Amino acid sequence: MKLINTFATELPWACEPVVPQPLREPRLLHLNRGLLAELGLDGVSDTDWLACCGLGQPLPGMQPVAQVYAGHQFGGYSPRLGDGRALLLGEQLATDGQRWDLHLKGAGKTPFSRFGDGRAVLRSSIREYLASEALHALGIPTTRALVLVGSKEPVYREQEETGATVLRTAPSHLRFGHIEYFAWSGQGEKIPALIDYLLRYHFPELENGAELFAEVVRRTARLIAKWQAAGFCHGVLNTDNMSLLGLTLDYGPYGFIDAYVPDFVCNHSDPDGRYALDQQPAVGYWNLQKLAQALAGHVDGDALATSLAQYEHQLMLHYSELMRAKLGLTQWEEEDPALFRQLFQLLASQGVDYHLFLRRLGEVTGTGEWPASLLALLPDPDLWQGWLELYRVRLTREGGEDAVRKAQMDAINPKYVLRNALAQQAIDAAEGGDMTQFERLLAALQQPYDEQPEYADLATPVPQWYCGGELSCSS
């Protein structure tokens, strides 16, 4: 392994040194061995990972720090947030030259913990581990999970739970909130150094802050387009949870939709639906506006405005490409928006499972009967006849072989999705000491487009009573 600490040494004013705190009777629950090997960390023993992530004993060369940042939370500005329970242990320099943060969540109190205990619970740690690996397998930019450690440490949320840690990794955990903190705390002179750090280590192909902001806009637009196409709701899109690298960051009360509910809210702390599924594109733009305001004075205002003006076009362009691919369409036609709109209206009014519908839609052929597996999903198949006929006519104009189209659709419409019901089953078993369900679910999610008949029980509709469940922010 090759550990470096560029953030801690080059931006010492943006972090505080912190000693991680040990958990009571920690136990190693999972290692992402494939990813560890990719990062050149496969030489670290299981014992050392347990010591690092559970016993408060960083590996040689690590300099743990908690980063400081601010953020707009549910529309209101919080001037000083920071890593309240996570530590940047160091950065691994992989064989290809890419830097990878080693970021330990649940490591104990930091100067930014405020009234928190600095801990993470097993429930939320499992959810983060599963989600980061699931989104990665779906091709959605995200932080990744390396190590999961459980313990007998009592942690109090709505009820008593047990403490855990997740070692997560990404090229950087820099957020919109990092820029905001220095912009609005009277330390604006430090923003050029942050921009320079980002350009040198993460955007070497770019030359200045204007180009950097344009790229952040582009990446944010594409990320949210991918979320929308995948039916993924983040749940807490505060600016401190927005990555400057365009990654899915900080998994809290997230959720994939089951039945198609456009205004799906997965966070019960969001009664007004500010961060509902269908609001994510607009929230992304609002957050980028706040980032632009923080950069004003350091980046040309006209350049900021020009980049912001491109956001909606970039998001809709990528989203349209993704949805056409999900329907097996390779060409754009003027009627496509109407075709999509009618589909979404039917899905919503009928409460049809979004993921299973798209997966089984791939079985439609140019002629013959409608697939029985598809019809079985529809409460009232007669209501669908008009749309299905339009879709078949559209496929006929496209041409191509049915088998080829099905293979292409299967490669973008997952069979296995991280449904909250499945995650909860894995959590319940893990809290009882059984990691088997977690292991099975993780394995299925890491190959979401493959048939994997041994995991077929994980690809069935969830009970109707569970659909649309909201979750707590507590973790």
Curated annotation (Swiss-Prot):
EC number: 2.7.7.-, 2.7.7.108
Positions of ATP binding: 82, 84-85, 105, 117-118, 168, 175, 250
Positions with a binding annotation for Mg(2+): 241, 250
Keywords: ATP-binding, Magnesium, Manganese, Metal-binding, Nucleotide-binding, Nucleotidyltransferase, Transferase
Catalytic activity line of the entry: L-seryl-[protein] + ATP = 3-O-(5'-adenylyl)-L-seryl-[protein] + diphosphate; L-threonyl-[protein] + ATP = 3-O-(5'-adenylyl)-L-threonyl-[protein] + diphosphate; L-tyrosyl-[protein] + ATP = O-(5'-adenylyl)-L-tyrosyl-[protein] + diphosphate; L-histidyl-[protein] + UTP = N(tele)-(5'-uridylyl)-L-histidyl-[protein] + diphosphate
Pfam family name, one: SelO
Active-site annotation: 240
One term of GO molecular function: ATP binding
Cofactor: Mg(2+); Mn(2+)
Function: Nucleotidyltransferase involved in the post-translational modification of proteins. It can catalyze the addition of adenosine monophosphate (AMP) or uridine monophosphate (UMP) to a protein, resulting in modifications known as AMPylation and UMPylation.
Family: Belongs to the SELO family.
Protein name: Protein nucleotidyltransferase YdiU
Source organism of the structure: Aeromonas salmonicida (strain A449)
Gene: ydiU
